């Protein structure tokens, strides 16, 4: 049993390491960057540009007059939402020089393997 798997094959480390999807659930806080509250009438457009942390919301509270119309026309960009910048180093230490948990699960005889081979079991154990 090389590594933590059977016959040199690793035991698997979850969906994040196998190329499958990694589901994430989030909940946004209430928007605090732009607020318009008044009993008056607003006409025209409000333009906001820049990087916003959330997509945003629109809310109408109160009563509309019985005569006339009331509406909200709300849009946010072109629909292309993505991460523009991430923090962190971007590179991790993974090369063990053959004396531990090295690159690609290769332990070089001194890892967690069996018979001079092995590794952590997350990759091929030879």
Curated annotation (Swiss-Prot):
Disulfide bridge map: none
Region (Right arm (Gly-rich tandem repeats)): 87-126
Known function: This protein is one of many from the eggshell of the silk moth.
Signal peptide, first to last residue: none
Protein's name according to its UniProt entry: Chorion class B protein M1768
Family per record: Belongs to the chorion protein family.
Region called Central domain, residue ranges: 18-86
Classification via InterPro entries: Chorion
Keyword Repeat: yes
Keyword field contains Repeat: yes
GO cellular component, one term: egg chorion
Region of interest (Left arm), ranges: 1-17
Keywords: Repeat
GO terms, biological process: chorion-containing eggshell formation
One Gene Ontology term of the molecular function aspect: structural constituent of egg chorion
């Amino acid at each position: 049993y090389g590594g933590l798997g059977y016959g040199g094959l690793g035991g698997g480390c979850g969906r994040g390491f196998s190329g499958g999807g990694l589901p994430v659930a989030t909940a946004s806080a209430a928007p605090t960057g732009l607020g318009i509250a008044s009993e008056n009438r607003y006409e025209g457009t409000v333009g906001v540009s820049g990087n916003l942390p959330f997509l945003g919301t629109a809310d109408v509270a109160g009563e509309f007059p019985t005569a006339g119309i009331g509406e909200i026309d709300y849009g946010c960009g072109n629909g292309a939402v993505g991460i523009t910048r991430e923090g962190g180093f971007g590179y991790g230490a993974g090369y063990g020089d053959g004396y531990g948990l090295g690159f690609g699960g290769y332990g070089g005889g001194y890892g967690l393997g069996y018979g001079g081979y092995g590794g952590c079991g997350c990759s091929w154990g030879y």
